[in-house]
């Protein structure tokens, strides 16, 4: 399975959070949004300019800027959840 930064994951793909490489304060905030190692994430859509992007975690849609998402690493489990 591929591991990639969440910001690089294709729209329609899904995976499991492998790790988060951010300062504790930011990681703590992301944990409250559902971004924890082992959590399933779907990449739903991106803004027309590419940033921010919307992800689904436990049935909740969450928007993140790429500058944050580039530090969250995802183990890809599905290339396109629409198929």
Question: How should these model regions be labeled?
Answer:
Residues 2, 25-29:
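Short alpha-helix capping/helix-loop boundary micro-motifs
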Residues 13-26, 75:
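Short, structured beta-strand/loop micro-motifs enriched in basic residues and often containing a Trp
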Residues 50-83:
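C-terminal structural segments of small proteins and small subunits
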